[in-house]
Amino acid sequence: MSLNRSEKQAVIDEVTGLAAKAQTLVMAEYRGITVADMTKLRSQAREKGVTLSVLKNTLARRAVAGSAFEVLSDQMTGPLIYGFSIDAVAAAKVVADFAKTNDKLVIRAGAFAGKTLDVEGVKQLANIPSKDVLLAQLCGLLMSPISRTAAVLAALSAQRGAGVEEVAEAAEPAAEVTEAAAA
C-alpha cells in the first residue's frame, strides 16, 4: 500500500513524537512471524506501555533524525518492528522476552541515552528490573531498619511485661503474709 505525501508526513510526525518522549528504542526483525504471534507481541507491549510500530525504514530514519535514536539510522534495513518506550527497560524486556519463546523474532539493535546497543546490550537492558520493582526494593530496604527496630521494641516490651508479671506474682504472696500478720 502506497502512502501519499501527506500520509507519509503524518506517520513521520507521529513517530517523531514517540521518539521525543521515549527513552528506549529497540529494533527487531520479524520475518516469518505469524499474525497471531504478532498480535500477542503487540498485546504484551501494550500492557507494558511499549509502542510497537512496523514502519517503512525510510520514514523511520526521517522520524528519528535529530533525536537520540538517530544513531540507529544506518541499521534500519529489512523488515523491522520498532519498539518505543518511556520506561528505560520496558521495550527491551518485551522484545527480549518474546524473542526467547519465538525464534522468528530476532533482535537487531537498540538505543538508550543516545548510545547504540547491540543484541547483548539489549538483552542486558532487559535484565534490569523495572522502575516499579526498583522502587519497591528501595522501600523494602528503607523499611527494614524500622521493622527490625519495631520487632526489638516489641520483644523488649514482652520481656519487660513478663518481668512485671513475675514481680507482681511474687508480691501477691508477700502481701498475703503481711495481711495475715497484721490481722
Curated annotation (Swiss-Prot):
Record has Transcription as a keyword: no
MF-aspect GO terms: large ribosomal subunit rRNA binding; structural constituent of ribosome
Protein name, as recorded: Large ribosomal subunit protein uL10
Provenance organism: Polaromonas naphthalenivorans (strain CJ2)
Record note on quaternary structure: Part of the ribosomal stalk of the 50S ribosomal subunit. The N-terminus interacts with L11 and the large rRNA to form the base of the stalk. The C-terminus forms an elongated spine to which L12 dimers bind in a sequential fashion forming a multimeric L10(L12)X complex.
Annotated Gene Ontology cellular component terms: large ribosomal subunit
Function: Forms part of the ribosomal stalk, playing a central role in the interaction of the ribosome with GTP-bound translation factors.
Key words, A-Z: Ribonucleoprotein, Ribosomal protein, RNA-binding, rRNA-binding
Pfam family, one: Ribosomal_L10
Lineage summary: Bacteria, Pseudomonadati, Pseudomonadota, Betaproteobacteria, Burkholderiales
HAMAP family, per database record: Ribosomal_uL10
S-S bonds: none
Gene name as annotated: rplJ
UniProt-listed Gene3D superfamilies: 3.30.70.1730, 6.10.250.290
NCBIfam families given in the database record: PRK00099.1-1
